[in-house]
Amino acid sequence: EVKLLESGGGLVQPGGSLKLSCAASGFDFSRYWMSWVRQAPGKGLEWIGEINPDSSTINYTPSLKDKFIISRDNAKNTLYLQMSKVRSEDTALYYCARLGYYGYFDVWGAGTTVTVSSE
């Protein structure tokens, strides 16, 4: 069974950092481009960025490229999202997704929730 499982979400204070993980199984992770996508409460999906199979190319949405770092470990079949300098606007459900051969996301995880709050 092809699966993606995100983890690492939780409550983080404004200005803080958090590292999300996405464990892949059931397919050859090292052959696929992978992406992170998020959905803030009451809003649509927002693409964060993508990484190619050997990590030589990493693309970000311009507004997030100075805050977020995408990486991967093919030996561990795991994708990462390092978040820094988080703000309340970063509160969202964060998904990892596999980019299929036909140019669309063909496998999604269930997501992990990140809440940015000082309370």
Curated annotation (Swiss-Prot):
Residues 1-112 form the Ig-like domain. Disulfide bonds: none annotated. CDD domains: IgV_H. InterPro entries: Ig-like_dom, Ig-like_dom_sf, Ig-like_fold, Ig_sub, Ig_V-set, IgHV. Pfam families: V-set. GO terms for biological process: adaptive immune response. GO terms for cellular component: extracellular region; immunoglobulin complex. Keywords: Adaptive immunity, Immunity, Immunoglobulin. It comes from the Eukaryota. Transmembrane segments: none annotated. This chain was isolated from an IgA myeloma protein that binds galactan. PANTHER family: IMMUNOGLOBULIN HEAVY CHAIN. This is Ig heavy chain V region T601. It comes from Mus musculus.
